[in-house]
Structures are given as structure tokens and as C-alpha cells.
């Protein structure tokens, strides 16, 4: 894609340029958030509440108070 066709498509009208920026930011945010959440949950597997809650409900919790 040459520069002139890129200019005519995205940069000539400000509304299209701003819309492209917002759409790109939205897509980047969605992909970045999904990737970071997946990495975080994988890195902390077994330590998160959703993992601990299942063990407590099953009765495998080590309760020294009882």
C-alpha cells in the first residue's frame, strides 16, 4: 500500500483518522487485557480465590482452629 493511498484512506478526513485510532486502541486494549489476565492466572494457579474456594468447599482446607 503506497503512502498516497494510505493518506487518502485514513488521514485525509479527521473523523476517519480519529475513528481508526479509537478502534485500534479498543482492539489493543482487549487483546492486551486478555493476554495479561491469562498470564496472571497461569502464573498464580492454585493461589487465586477461584482455586482456593473449590478446595474449601470440598473440605480439603487445613483448619487448625477446630
From Swiss-Prot:
Its main location: mitochondrion. Coiled coil: none annotated. Residues 44-66 are mitochondrial intermembrane. One of its GO terms (biological process) is mitochondrial electron transport, ubiquinol to cytochrome c. One of its GO terms (cellular component) is mitochondrion. InterPro entries: QCR9, QCR9_sf. Residues 2-17 are mitochondrial matrix. It holds the Pfam family UCR_UQCRX_QCR9. Gene3D superfamilies: Cytochrome b-c1 complex subunit 9. Keywords: Electron transport, Membrane, Mitochondrion, Mitochondrion inner membrane, Respiratory chain, Transmembrane, Transmembrane helix, Transport. It is found in: Mitochondrion inner membrane. Belongs to the UQCR10/QCR9 family. Component of the ubiquinol-cytochrome c oxidoreductase, a multisubunit transmembrane complex that is part of the mitochondrial electron transport chain which drives oxidative phosphorylation. Component of the ubiquinol-cytochrome c oxidoreductase (cytochrome b-c1 complex, complex III, CIII), a multisubunit enzyme composed of 10 subunits. The complex is composed of 3 respiratory subunits cytochrome b (COB), cytochrome c1 (CYT1) and Rieske protein (RIP1), 2 core protein subunits COR1 and QCR2, and 5 low-molecular weight protein subunits QCR6, QCR7, QCR8, QCR9 and QCR10. This is Cytochrome b-c1 complex subunit 9, mitochondrial.
